Amino acid sequence: MQVTLKTLQQQTFKIDIDPEETVKALKEKIESEKGKDAFPVAGQKLIYAGKILSDDTALKEYKIDEKNFVVVMVTKPKAVTSAVPATTQQSSSPSTTTVSSSPAAAVAQAPAPTPALAPTSTPASTTPASTTASSEPAPTGATQPEKPAEKPAQTPVLTSPAPADSTPGDSSRSNLFEDATSALVTGQSYENMVTEIMSMGYEREQVIAALRASFNNPDRAVEYLLMGIPGDRESQAVVDPPPQAVSTGTPQSPAVAAAAATTTATTTTTSGGHPLEFLRNQPQFQQMRQIIQQNPSLLPALLQQIGRENPQLLQQISQHQEHFIQMLNEPVQEAGGQGGGGGGGGGGGGGGGGIAEAGSGHMNYIQVTPQEKEAIERLKALGFPEGLVIQAYFACEKNENLAANFLLQQNFDED
């Protein structure tokens, strides 16, 4: 029989296989024909008629119609991501030994093993760093020689804005952004994805709720449809936030990436847990969480901004997508806590973007120059609502062309 397979990214291909074979045999054939990197057997989930196919069951048992298709969903293995923080800590050892003899030489050598530790290897905090490295020597010792060879190209972006390094830096940031947003869909792609998932037998309302709870991540949305939306995310999937709340927090989004850029290097070296855990304590991240929960379509723009200001953070997000989405899905603090966090974000934004806050977290007023007001008016003249225009304009760092492109890509046929 010939099985038609379709990915959530709209890729379609066919596999010839005996119906007596098991589902696992089909997965192995997909891996052999499409590549182990893109379709590993362990990461494949095959879905037909709204059900996940069991590995040990024969294909004929599912009565697959050759005119229909089987959805193939690939999840990334978690073993790859868990090794990253270990190698990052381990590779700090050679940089700290260099510091003790010559601080000047450390500046040239430290970035090569690990960009995350380069800013903190020169100050007097090298002793704790070396202690951390020596506490976990054995597991990653074999991989240490390979890591320095892979990362030097990204290091100049973090440590030096020299013009000669702009080309590799831009390309690396672009690749990181593509990795971080590869699983997300917006605009017309969103509508196509809704239709695609509905063809699996689900109602439109169910699909939209699942996509909302997963921040438009189609892989996760299908999992929610199959397994059920977790209880802590159901209210977020069903309840639509008031438009005022969206426009209230969004102008502070540039401060989110800027604050993260100034804190990431020092925090990741001292954190003993997950590389992204330090974000929980950042008021700016709490505001970002509120913004994204209210308007998930802004996530790609915010990731792009983070990629420009802090490629290292974007790399961590790309390597730990599931954990990052989980953190974004966590409930936002109550009104009192939000008010305090809003004040901190407003202060940070006031220095760089001219954002001023009025009241106790209920309304934020934005100070704009006449030129910025004209740009906002021009975007409104394209036919977009003022609230969405302000969101896009500030999320795109006041870049009028980028904001216009962002707005044109969005789907405004929602509630």
UniProtKB/Swiss-Prot annotation:
Modification type Phosphoserine: residues: 160, 174, 199
Modified residues (Phosphotyrosine): 202
Record keywords, A-Z: Cytoplasm, DNA damage, DNA repair, Nucleus, Phosphoprotein, Proteasome, Repeat, Ubl conjugation pathway
Domain STI1: start-end pairs: 274-317
One GO location term (cellular component): nucleus
InterPro entries: Rad23 (IPR004806), RAD23A/B_UBA1 (IPR041811), STI1_HS-bd (IPR006636), UBA (IPR015940), UBA-like_sf (IPR009060), Ubiquitin-like_dom (IPR000626), Ubiquitin-like_domsf (IPR029071), XPC-bd (IPR015360)
Pfam family membership, one: UBA
Biased composition (Gly residues): 336-355
Annotated region described as Disordered, given as residue ranges: 80-175, 334-355
Coiled coil ranges: none
Biased composition regions of type Low complexity, renumbered to the chain: 84-143
Protein location: Nucleus; Cytoplasm
Entry's Gene Ontology molecular function annotations: damaged DNA binding; DNA damage sensor activity; polyubiquitin modification-dependent protein binding; proteasome binding; RNA polymerase II cis-regulatory region sequence-specific DNA binding; RNA polymerase II-specific DNA-binding transcription factor binding; transcription cis-regulatory region binding; ubiquitin binding
Location of the UBA domain: 188-228, 370-410
Stated family: Belongs to the RAD23 family.
NCBIfam families on file: rad23
Quaternary structure (record): Component of the XPC complex composed of XPC, RAD23B and CETN2. Interacts with NGLY1 and PSMC1. Interacts with ATXN3. Interacts with AMFR. Interacts with VCP; the interaction is indirect and mediated by NGLY1.
Role of this protein: Multiubiquitin chain receptor involved in modulation of proteasomal degradation. Binds to polyubiquitin chains. Proposed to be capable to bind simultaneously to the 26S proteasome and to polyubiquitinated substrates and to deliver ubiquitinated proteins to the proteasome. May play a role in endoplasmic reticulum-associated degradation (ERAD) of misfolded glycoproteins by association with PNGase and delivering deglycosylated proteins to the proteasome.
UniProt-recorded name of the protein: UV excision repair protein RAD23 homolog B
Organism lineage: Eukaryota, Metazoa, Chordata, Craniata, Vertebrata
